[in-house]
Design a protein with these regions (language model features):
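Winged-helix/helix-turn-helix nucleic-acid-interaction surface
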Residues: 57, 61-94
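Short recognition helix of helix-turn-helix/winged-helix DNA-binding domains
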Residues: 1-52, 81-82
Length: 94
């Protein structure tokens, strides 16, 4: 996986330093890598996501919410109780 310079030079400092949300950066990075591996959206539960990056389920949920607010992550579900599908956004590439 190739990481955009922006992710390391700007986004990491912004999420970890300014926003004080290091888990959000880990979630973003892991989902970006997984999206590349799967060649598309990532469908995964909060519990599986949390276990994949080594954090609590509530920390993963909070991070996903923060990334959605920052428009760095699109989340969709086919039903309210369905497992979410994630699509990493790269707004700096527009």
């Amino acid at each position: 996986m190739t990481i955009d310079d922006y992710v390391v030079d700007v986004l990491m400092r912004d999420l970890v330093g300014h926003d004080k949300r290091p888990v959000a950066f880990l979630v973003y990075l892991w989902l970006a890598a997984e999206q590349t591996r799967r060649n598309g959206t990532v469908q995964i539960s909060y519990q599986e996501l949390a276990e994949s990056i080594g954090v609590s389920k509530s920390a993963a949920q909070s991070a996903v919410g923060w990334l959605k607010r920052r428009k760095l992550l699109m989340v969709s579900k086919v039903a309210v109780t369905a497992t979410p599908c994630y699509k990493v956004q790269r707004p700096w590439k527009r």
